[in-house]
Every structure is written in structure tokens, then in C-alpha cells.
């Protein structure tokens, strides 16, 4: 409590807190809180001798961000006052005067009674007051307490695409609102399994064996490894992008478009959409191939006995059945998309069972290989679909008669007088084991490639029979297409796509930033292992001619991979059929929603119609367009021709994902803070290079077409072309590029994600034109991890015509210092008659177009208390007011000479952030930027916030930790409780001393003695040039003072001066009897209490960042404002006072 000496001056000074719930606290949006409509709170003054301890110790509310308290302040500075609360308001001079209700004095200027608002007669609608945060109360409407925001900032809602429409439709039909379920899916169910289902597909079952047989084990292993490396590098880049903020529902398109902008985002989004649509066509074609070739071959509508026409007939069958399947699947998606999602797990189970059957069969083949004989004529493979026996003759009733094979190669069914094929005559028909098994050593024969032209007979590579041509009408197994390494790359690549399935479900994930990287990378590792191991197993277990037999003609029409599986080939056939059907349904479900998301962004006007949906959110028009494009893929009818098209679009998409990550990393934008740490721009660049190489390796003409399509979309969206203004060589090119870039920059404020500190550093110069505080420039260089603009400015007071040379010299001095401190930026000096005007001109006019500063950096005016000249601190406060009016952020470095140089490096320590009021998030962003510099890199960030009596400090700490997690900022969190609201004697006396000093200086300035008159006259006449620094330059007071000095001395003026001295002595006598103003006591109480807790927690911190209170609305309180700031920062070595510009500079979203 109060010491005895304090009681002689005051009876009792206490705060009485009466908590009251405010019902109209404004709601806050997830991205940018609405800070403009905060309701005000009521304050009244009363007198009480005692307040029960329970009124200060009991927690009043546990609702963070939803309720706040209304403070009822009891303040009785004099013991002779009456206890009636109305006594406080009886004096007319104590009426509240705000900016809108100011009294107009005789001089025509608005003037309030106190420096700050003193609202003792409260009316509804006035400003917000808080017992412990009185210093910040004037701006509580625009800079609210942290405790009132944390709950809304930490808890955001993530709706999936169409979920809002679904919910609204259900509410309309059911007549009541159902609570929205929060996302609960984890890494395994939400990312890992969907990625497995989308990566494993038709290529694994229908084409991988053929790829191994054609390319050989070594080249096939290389193809699979390159494709898997491409997707792994892309997944790393995607993980960095996905963990750079809260991923909205919408997945990959939103990640790419928000990372690269609307032009690239629209182009890549459409490429991704077309890829997904053609994937649906590919899966449908795969399902039809399994159905017609392996399950029900008799269902074929078109048939041909001619080997050359058989493939054409098969393509027509694929078109008919494919169209029918597409219509059926579109109806399923249109009517019941929920059933598609419900059966997804069943389709995934089919895939997993099929893969396990392959491994089981490979293991079993090592000791008991399955019996699948292959009929060979010499080295040539025969189709066993129409053979009754693998022999030229057969025994019937003890008689040797020609077999069906004889009839295929001879023109007569009789042994005599038959003319047979020459190769048939000279070679024997033998039967070999199609699956020799793992221990057979067949792996050595399958190591090397065996590429064939179209129509070539498949035969053993050891002894080719190229000397005798075969008749294509015979029952040979033929190559249906011309094969090459590049073709196989294009065909196989779709089997590794699908890595974005997890990010597409981002809205359903409980913690997307954790689940997407882990689940995606684990899924790629799993699928890569399966593919690579299957390449080796297929080559080690299956005969080469069987591997190259794409449709299983040599093994009686069985699926080749099915012949290896255990317990039955039908496990693979049925499993692969259902898995391809499921994958097709998933593609037809996802592609329309992707198109709908692109259309809703309204970046491509002619797609706007596809953004409309049914009442339940289903994109009907987008589904119809998707079906039409998929039909084009089905009309192609060949899986081997559709796969390279699909590869192009996915490779284009992956290329831009890697490009986005590489650009963000190299540009080092402040918003680029991925929680996933294992990325590097070199990995992204390597992934981008592999994607580009694969595009041209697989099909160079398809690659060019895909790029042209993407380029046309980019051009359509925004690109208008740069003017060819070359000038004189490289400099002309640089000027043209700079002009083009400046014109492209937005004139308006940038998006929160793109905000970076563009600094205007105000430096002080001494009489020799040297920088007084070079460490301020050092600090600015350490902040430039944001890679923004830096302008170094200073003001020389004088006449421009006379001081132009000095300005050039000072500019060169500053440039040399900038070079020494490695600050890349521009220097701007202004010669002005008055310092305030010069600073105002700098703040208003620096920069060009979109490259304008948004943050002002300046030093604290040290020694302002000791200076007789008030211009030092008046210039400082004027600068604060100008930056506030310009909506710029302000950084004030106190004790800047103690700040570290670029050579010093802290090996440990803390950067402490005291987040008291929210003003845009600058306090969160600055320590992150500082930690990017080597000087501060090893420091840890600690964030403190203040809890009042009514706040739930435990919930505040949880909310703050959650908010920082979403911001991707690693920091230690602590909530400091400030429950004690007693005003101490020290606070009271400190306020009294402050007010006495201000009053005394005011009297001294009004009654200057004449002993300085002659000295001042000589000094003014002899000073030809006076260069003053920011903080101690000419002001309007200069003219007034000089008028006093140069006045003519008369008897009347002497008598007037003598009377003024007597009046001045009476004023000094009044100082001894004055009592401190109540509002100043409360503000001093805030400064003292905050300083106590800050010094207690942060006295050893390497740097303390603190909210800077705004200057008083009434200029009469400027000196008190400086005193409050001094008290607030006493006892701290390095302090950075931060004042936001009023706009959000940091966001949790990507």
C-alpha cells in the first residue's frame, strides 16, 4: 500500500472494477478483423476509502475475445472532496471534450482542457477506457486489446468447396441450422490413403509389365525412378506451399494461384483441370480394356479375323463402350456424389489386395511357379487364343493328324501336297514356361531393352529370325505400336500422378499444415517402392516374350500381371477393374469442382457460367463440360495415346508448383514462412527441370501444344506484352524492365500476403554533415530480409539555392555509409526552410508509383528533458502525427547506439515482443524478419501479452499459441496478468513532478530574462549556416523567440515586463499547490505498471519490441506524452517502439 509520506498528499487512490458484459462486440473475419465498430465502455469516477480484496482478485470472465469489462474508476486525489460522485462533474471545466465536441476558444482554435481525454461525465458512445491500459485508450476503436482478438484469430472455420451451399440447402429444407462439423480427418485417412488410391492406377496393372519387357529392367527402373523423383521433388515444393499458411478448401489450384498470381494460376489451374479430365478418360479406357479383353471378350461388338483390322475393331469397341461407361459414371456423379466418396475405401481396398496378390505370387513363384505355358515357333511367340494344342500335329484315335496350328501355316489340312510357311517348316514348335519364377535366373535375359516397330513379331532377343519374314495373318503375337524410351516415359508417367489428392482435401483435415507434407511424402515413398520393386520382380519372374505381350495373347488372354499373382489371376482382374472405375469416378467428381473454383475466381470471363451450381453446391454445368472433354479422350480410344496427353498437363502443373516454390524462396517475401522446413530452391529448380525434360522426352509436339495452350490462357487473362524500348544496350533494357515493372505494380495497397516493409529511414546530420546515428542504418539493413524498398532520407534546414552543394555532399556521405552497411536502396535529401516541413515532404513524396515506403524508421530524441529547446521533442511528435495521418507504420529505435553492428552476432538471447494492442501485426512480423539476419539468427522469440482482471489468461495463452502456429512463427508464449489496479504513491508523485515541470517550463518560456538578449543577438547575426538535425531544428517558435530578442526597449515595455515577472512568480507559487490531473495519473499508472512487468520479464532481452501509444489529440499534452514513453521504456537497453499503419501486414492464410 501507500507509504506514510504519500498519505499527506492524498487520502486514498484506488480503482474499483465493475465487470459488465458488452453484447455488441463486433465480429471478426478470419482474414482481416473489423476493428472499426468497437463499442465504447463506460467510466465514472467516485470516491471510496476501501475496496474489498475480492473485487480485485476474483476472475470475472473466462470468455476470451467475446466479453470485456467496463471499468468503474474510483479516484480521490484530495481528502477534502465530498464522497458524492456528482461532485466530480460539477465543475464546468471538467466536462469531457472529444475531437468532435471541442470548445471553440476566442482564437478560433479547438482546445481541450486536458492533454488527453478526461471523461468524468460519461455518455454513451464515448471512447473506451481500461484501468491498466489508459495510455492506449484514445485508439482502442482502431487498435483493440489483444485479449479481445485472440479467440477469433486462433479459431478459424475452413469450409470445403460447396460445403456452405450444402449447409444452406439443408437449412432451407429442414428449417433449422445444423452445427457445422469441424474438420477431423488425420494424416492417414485424410492424405495418405487418398494419395495411394490416386497414384496407384490402371498403368500398374495394364502396362507396367509391358514397359519392363520392352525397356528392360535397367531402363524401366530408370523410367520409374525419374518419374518418382519428379513427383517427390514436386511434393516437397507443394508441402512448402501448403504449409505456408492455412490452406483454404480448394486444394492445389488455390495453392498455385495464390502463390503465382491470377495469370499463372489461371493457366496452371486449367492445365490441372484438363489433366484431371483426361485422367477420367484414361481410367474409363482402362476399365473397358479390362472388361473386353480379360473379363468378357465375347461382349465385343466389332470383330475382325484379319490381324491388321483387329486393332481397328478394338478401338471402335472402346469408343462405344467407353461412351456408355462415361454416361453411366456422369449420372452416378450427378445423382449421388456421396456414394462415390463412400465407395472410395472399397476401391482402395481392391487396389491394396491386388498389389498384395502380386507380391504373394512373386514369393510363391520362387518355389512353386504357376503353370502358364507359352507356345513358341522357333523364337517367335504364338497366340494361344485359338490353339487347341502347342504342336504341329496331334494324336486322335492312335492316328497323327494336323493340329489347328498346321492349318494356320499350311494351305491344306493334309500332310501330303500341303504348302507350308518356310519358317514353319524349318522350326519346331515348343512350349516354354511363361512364369519361370524368382529363382530361374531369367532376370539376366530381361535386363536389356527390346524396342520394336509396329507389326513386328514378338520373339526371343537371343536369336532373332530376321532372315525369314513372317506372314502377319498367322497366329503370331505382334507389336501393336512402335515403341521407344520416350514413348514409355509418356505412357508410364500418369501412374505417378495423384500426389495432390491430399491437398485437395485440405478443408477436411484437422491440421493440414502437418498432414499434407507427411501424408503426401509417405504415399510417394510407398508407391515408389511398389513400382521399383515390381519392375525388378516382373523382370525376375516372367519370361521376356510374355512381358512384351501387351494383351496376354500368349497366355490364353490372361492379364500378364494376373498370371503372376496368387491365389488366382481373377484377383488382379476384378481388383484392377473396380479400382479403375473408382479412379474414374473420383476424377469426374474432382474435375468439375476444380473448374467451378476457377470460374468463381472470375479470372476467365467466358468460364463464368461454369461457376454456377445446384442448390446443394453440385457444379452441374462444369460436370457437363467435363464429360464433353472426357468424351474427346474416349474417342481417341487408345490408352497409349491418351496417357501422353495426360502427362503433359500434369507435368505442366508440377512445373509451376516447383517454380512457385523456387521463386518464393529466392524472393524471400516476408509472408514466405513454410512450416515444412525441408525444402530448398535448388530442389524446386531441379524438379522444374525434370518436369520440363520429361515433357519434351515423352512427346515434344504435345509439350509445345500444352505450352501454347497455357500461354494463350495467360495472355487472355492479363498479359498485354512489354514495349520493345531497348535504348542503349543493357541500360536501356534495364530502364524498360523497370518501367514495365513499375507500371505493373498496383497503385493501391498490396494484399496482406505481399506486404513487406518498404523503409524510409530518417537520419540526423551534425554540423559537419556526418550521420549522428549510423546504427539506425545498420538496423535497417538487418530488417531487409523482407527484400523491400529502402529510402534513406534527411533534411537540411536552409535555402535550396544556397545549400544545394551541402545537400550533394551530405548525399554522398550517406551513400558511402549505405555501401559500408550493405544497404541496397536510395538516398533522398531535402532542403527546407523548416524541419517539420522537410520531414513532411519526405514522408509524402518519397518513392515512385507502387514503389513507395510504408514504414518510417527514426531514432528517439535523446536528451529531450535536458534540452531547453522544446523543438527536439516537438519535431518528433510532429513526425509521429504525420506518419499516422499518412497511414504508415512507424519504428522508433530507443538507445540506438546500443544496437548491434552487422559484425556482431548474438550466440543466444531473446527478442521479446510485448503485444498489448493489435495494430496490424507488425509486432509479429518484425522479429521474424530480424531472425533472417545473421546477427539475430540464434535469438529466440518470446511473445508476451497482457491479461486484465476479466480475461481468461489460460485460454489467452492457448489462443496465442494457436495463432502463432497458423502464422508459422516459432515463439515462446507468455500471458502476463496485471490484476493490481492500485495507483501507487510513486505513480502519483511522478505525475505531479511531470506536470510541475511542464508548467514551470511554460512559465520560463513566457518570461525570458534579458541577460541573454545581447548574446543571442550576436549569435544569430554571426551564424551564416545552421545545419540542424531531425529532433532539434527550427520551428514556428523560432520566429516568435527572435521577435522577443530584437524588440525595442522602452519604459512601457519595461513596466510590462516587470508586471509579467510578478505574474510569473505567482505562477511558480501555484506550482507548489497544484494537484495532478486524473487522466494523467491513470496514464502514468499504465506506463509504470507496464514498465514494471516489462523490466521484470525482459531486462536481459537483446531487443524489446513494444506497442507505441499514439500521441494525444490535444497538442498541449505533447510533453506529457514524451514523459509517458520515457517511463514506459525505462531500464531497457534496446527498445523498438512499433506503431502500425492501420492495415494488416501478416496473415495465417497461404
From Swiss-Prot:
<feature type="topological domain" description="Cytoplasmic">
    <location>
        <begin position="455"/>
        <end position="464"/>
    </location>
</feature>
<feature type="modified residue" description="Phosphoserine">
    <location>
        <position position="981"/>
    </location>
</feature>
<feature type="binding site">
    <location>
        <position position="448"/>
    </location>
    <ligand>
        <name>chloride 1</name>
    </ligand>
</feature>
<feature type="modified residue" description="Phosphoserine">
    <location>
        <position position="148"/>
    </location>
</feature>
<dbReference type="Pfam" id="PF00324">
    <property type="entry name" value="AA_permease"/>
</dbReference>
<feature type="topological domain" description="Extracellular">
    <location>
        <begin position="159"/>
        <end position="165"/>
    </location>
</feature>
<feature type="topological domain" description="Extracellular">
    <location>
        <begin position="317"/>
        <end position="433"/>
    </location>
</feature>
<dbReference type="InterPro" id="IPR004842">
    <property type="entry name" value="SLC12A_fam"/>
</dbReference>
<dbReference type="GO" id="GO:0015379">
    <property type="term" value="F:potassium:chloride symporter activity"/>
</dbReference>
<feature type="transmembrane region" description="Helical; Name=8">
    <location>
        <begin position="519"/>
        <end position="545"/>
    </location>
</feature>
<feature type="transmembrane region" description="Helical; Name=12">
    <location>
        <begin position="650"/>
        <end position="665"/>
    </location>
</feature>
<feature type="binding site">
    <location>
        <position position="497"/>
    </location>
    <ligand>
        <name>K(+)</name>
    </ligand>
</feature>
<feature type="transmembrane region" description="Helical; Name=4">
    <location>
        <begin position="264"/>
        <end position="287"/>
    </location>
</feature>
<dbReference type="GO" id="GO:0071477">
    <property type="term" value="P:cellular hypotonic salinity response"/>
</dbReference>
<keyword id="KW-0868">Chloride</keyword>
<feature type="binding site">
    <location>
        <position position="446"/>
    </location>
    <ligand>
        <name>K(+)</name>
    </ligand>
</feature>
<feature type="topological domain" description="Cytoplasmic">
    <location>
        <begin position="1"/>
        <end position="135"/>
    </location>
</feature>
<feature type="topological domain" description="Extracellular">
    <location>
        <begin position="246"/>
        <end position="263"/>
    </location>
</feature>
<keyword id="KW-1003">Cell membrane</keyword>
<dbReference type="InterPro" id="IPR004841">
    <property type="entry name" value="AA-permease/SLC12A_dom"/>
</dbReference>
<feature type="region of interest" description="Scissor helix">
    <location>
        <begin position="682"/>
        <end position="691"/>
    </location>
</feature>
<keyword id="KW-1015">Disulfide bond</keyword>
<feature type="modified residue" description="Phosphoserine">
    <location>
        <position position="32"/>
    </location>
</feature>
<feature type="binding site">
    <location>
        <position position="443"/>
    </location>
    <ligand>
        <name>K(+)</name>
    </ligand>
</feature>
<dbReference type="InterPro" id="IPR000076">
    <property type="entry name" value="KCL_cotranspt"/>
</dbReference>
<dbReference type="GO" id="GO:0030424">
    <property type="term" value="C:axon"/>
</dbReference>
<keyword id="KW-0769">Symport</keyword>
<feature type="modified residue" description="Phosphoserine">
    <location>
        <position position="736"/>
    </location>
</feature>
<feature type="topological domain" description="Cytoplasmic">
    <location>
        <begin position="666"/>
        <end position="1150"/>
    </location>
</feature>
<feature type="modified residue" description="Phosphoserine">
    <location>
        <position position="120"/>
    </location>
</feature>
<dbReference type="GO" id="GO:1990573">
    <property type="term" value="P:potassium ion import across plasma membrane"/>
</dbReference>
<feature type="modified residue" description="Phosphoserine">
    <location>
        <position position="1023"/>
    </location>
</feature>
<feature type="modified residue" description="Phosphoserine">
    <location>
        <position position="1029"/>
    </location>
</feature>
<comment type="subunit">
    <text>Homodimer; adopts a domain-swap conformation at the scissor helices connecting the transmembrane domain and C-terminal domain. Heterodimer with K-Cl cotransporter SLC12A5. Interacts (via C-terminus) with CKB; the interaction may be required for potassium-chloride cotransport activity.</text>
</comment>
<feature type="disulfide bond">
    <location>
        <begin position="410"/>
        <end position="420"/>
    </location>
</feature>
<dbReference type="GO" id="GO:0055075">
    <property type="term" value="P:potassium ion homeostasis"/>
</dbReference>
<dbReference type="GO" id="GO:0071805">
    <property type="term" value="P:potassium ion transmembrane transport"/>
</dbReference>
<feature type="modified residue" description="Phosphothreonine">
    <location>
        <position position="778"/>
    </location>
</feature>
<feature type="binding site">
    <location>
        <position position="447"/>
    </location>
    <ligand>
        <name>chloride 1</name>
    </ligand>
</feature>
<dbReference type="GO" id="GO:0006884">
    <property type="term" value="P:cell volume homeostasis"/>
</dbReference>
<keyword id="KW-0630">Potassium</keyword>
<dbReference type="Pfam" id="PF03522">
    <property type="entry name" value="SLC12"/>
</dbReference>
